[in-house]
Amino acid sequence: MGAIPTTSSAATLVPRLRRTLTLRDLILYGVIVLQPVAPMSAFGALSDRGRGHVVTAILIAMLAMLSTAISYGRMAQVYPSAGSAFTYVAQEIHPSAGYITGWSMVMDYIVNPLICTIWCAGQAHEFAPGLPVWGWKVFFAVVFTLLNLQGIKTSARVNAGMAAAMSAVVVLVFVCAIRYILGHPHNDFGFFTRPFYDPQTFTLGNLFGCTSLAVLTYIGFDAISTLSEEAENPKRNIMLATVGTCLVIGLLSAAEVYVAQLVWPASRPFPNQDTAYVYAAALTWAPLFKIVGLTLLIANFGSGMGAQIGAARLLYGMGRSNALPRSFFGKVDPKNHVPRNNVIFIGVIVLIGSFFLTFGRGIELLNFGALIAFMGVNAAAFVHYFVRSPQKKLTNFIPPVLGFFICLALWWSLSVPAKILGSIWMALGIAFGYWKTHGFREPLSFEVPAE
């Protein structure tokens, strides 16, 4: 075969991604990634932490995420092929700040499959109590690992079908909840406002503590920024789609938890906090116990599998760049083309961690890292579009500053144990990075390599 000529005409033969994704397509993709049932799994933990007030917490979290989404969308215009908080912060602020952001992302990637395993084990135990919860934890940790070792993954069509099925379940829950509420009339108008504000249990500490957990509902919206090369008018549509996704998920999530709190008030304890939404739904129509429970189990199963392989690929990228020992983390199984060592490594961490962490504490650790990354992106957008820009526009000042300080307040509202555990993780990572880069003088990569 002859050599490829290096002429300008040959360049036209290089395949490029077609820009076919409209604004609506991008928002739909974002909703699929975040899942229409996003707040249901965490409803019990949110209600317990906020003593109710879950609706208000989700709406406040939405305000923080909308500001952060604007920053993500704007940074995607500057770095259209990156889509990573690590890249934004490292390039705009300092490589050491980028490392801190990247290390917080590593914790997120590891904790995500862990909390999915914990939740799946709890729900499976509700369906089959003959096997203890610890047995289900072992089962799901092993199954996630074995399936990922085989390179099994769902197709885009299956994911879209699952999103449609979840949406149908959400509609069914709304119908049953409305029927139940109308069948149990309340003359007290406070009944309908209590999910927003209950004077008997409201404190700012409870509200912001709940809001710091509610951030989980929105984690993943930044995935839209990875579609810049396939989107029509990406400079406009990526930011609009990111903001639109947060808005759609926020309003939908608020509606979902609102009807749940009307049906099952915060003053009434749940039989199982982790599967609280399933019990609230079943109160409106008994078959929903199985319908909602199975839907959430499948959703968390898929999320757990995807999160584990995502974590394994991140560690592979770090191993390939020698940020981690290449001999272990930088290898790929030649048969199934997966980072085998990393999949097993994450599987072991998930299995052990599931016996020491609760679902609620896992959410806090996940948000500990996510909020650091969000603050980093807001800071990067502020530096690029305001500090370094000759034109000091308020539109380039308000969103990143607002997003940064709301995220900071939410991060500070995490529980003390979560902040201690997260800080230990960050301290170990910073010490490792300082040693590995000889005082942050050499680059380290936290980019997830393409499949």
Give, region by region, the residue ranges found by the protein language model.
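Extracellular loop-to-transmembrane helix junctions
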Residues: 39-136, 205, 245-255, 422, ...
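Membrane-helix boundary/coupling elements in multi-pass transport proteins
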Residues: 81, 104-118, 213, 218, ...
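Helix-loop-helix junctions that connect adjacent transmembrane segments
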Residues: 51-55, 129-132, 161-293, 418
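TM-loop-TM module centered on a large, flexible mid-protein loop between adjacent transmembrane helices
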Residues: 87-88, 94, 126, 241-305, ...
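Helix-loop-helix connectors at the membrane interface of multi-pass transporters/channels
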Residues: 3-7, 87-90, 96, 116-137, ...
